[in-house]
Regions:
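N-terminal amphipathic/hydrophobic targeting modules at extreme N-termini
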Residues: 3, 8-10, 18
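Alpha-helical and His/Cys-centered functional microenvironments
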Residues: 11, 20, 29, 43, ...
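A composition/secondary-structure signal for short, hydrophobic, low-basic-content segments
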Residues: 1-3, 21, 35, 210, ...
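Serine residues within intrinsically disordered or low-complexity segments
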Residues: 13-15, 19, 34
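Residue-level detector of alpha-helix boundary/anchor positions
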Residues: 21, 26-27, 142, 230
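Catalytic cores of nucleotide-sugar-dependent glycosyltransferases that transfer UDP/GDP/TDP-activated
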Residues: 39, 53-253
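Short, positively charged and aromatic/hydrophobic N-terminal segments
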Residues: 24-35, 39, 43-52
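Intrinsically disordered, low-complexity cationic segments
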Residues: 4-6, 24, 213, 238
């Protein structure tokens, strides 16, 4: 809704002259408009423009969202994701999957309810065929959406090859990286591999699928999905607090 309202406001601001044209010429209204009349009519036109703008939009069948803070409470992004999960679950009901880092290995994670039954066949396939070690369960928040936690540590062995691929394809420079860049990048890449594996095993090109990557820590995975699974639409959302925390935590100006 926020996006639609923003688009509407932009259309409203760009189409003010067009609105007056419609009011005075198409409808041939011949009396003098007061400010209230003009405002009322332009608001109506705004709604008409929005309707024609969004009437052909598609609703996805499946949604994947990845974030460093899925089942891993660090800061504000956790709040953003966890508070909207219940609404998304009501609409998509177990067709939305949150992907997070498996950073609680060997310890009990109070935010994660593991299940041996959820996606069991795919989980086995992912391990045996795609070399992905994942745990599947539910996020212990209202709505309890399905969560896939991926072990990204094995990807450190392929780090240089992954960075080379990112440079050759997208000119993403990793030579001057510092701090938590490597860890975030390996998780991001692993999350992209999870989407690819799940899609190839469970879904088809007739399914409308969206992958939303939250913050710079998941950007590399979004690039990977665009290349490896072009059937999946990608969205990248930045949360400025995370960038600031990374800069401050590594004593950078």
């Amino acid at each position: 809704n926020a996006v639609l309202h923003l688009q509407g406001d932009v259309l409203f601001s760009l189409s003010t002259n067009f609105s007056f044209f419609l009011l005075t010429h198409i409808f041939r209204i011949k009396y003098y408009f007061s400010k209230n009349n003009v405002y009322f009519c332009t608001r109506i036109l705004k709604r008409v423009l929005i309707y024609y703008m969004v009437k052909d939009l598609l609703t996805p069948d499946y949604i994947f969202e990845s974030s460093w803070e899925v089942c891993n409470k660090v800061g504000g992004i956790y709040t953003v994701l966890s508070t909207r999960a219940n609404t998304l679950q009501e609409k998509f009901r177990d067709r939305i999957f949150f992907i997070g880092p498996d950073v609680w290995q060997g310890k009990e994670n109070p935010l994660f309810i593991e299940s041996d039954n959820l996606c069991a066949a795919w989980k086995k396939h992912a391990l045996e065929k795609d070399e992905l070690s994942v745990r599947v369960g539910r996020w212990n928040i209202p709505g309890e959406p399905i969560v896939i936690l991926v072990d990204f540590q094995p990807f450190f062995e392929k780090k240089n090859d992954i960075y080379t691929e990112m440079w050759n394809r997208y000119q993403v420079d990793s030579l001057h990286a510092y701090g938590d860049y490597d860890e975030a990048s390996m998780f991001s890449y692993a999350a992209g591999k999870v989407v690819e594996s799940f899609y190839r095993y469970n879904l088809t090109e007739t399914d409308k699928v969206v992958y939303q990557a939250h913050e710079w820590m998941t950007g590399m995975g979004a690039l990977y999905v665009q290349e490896a699974v072009p059937e999946v639409a990608t969205i990248f959302t930045t949360h400025a607090t995370s960038i600031g925390r990374s800069i401050a935590g590594n004593n950078k100006p």
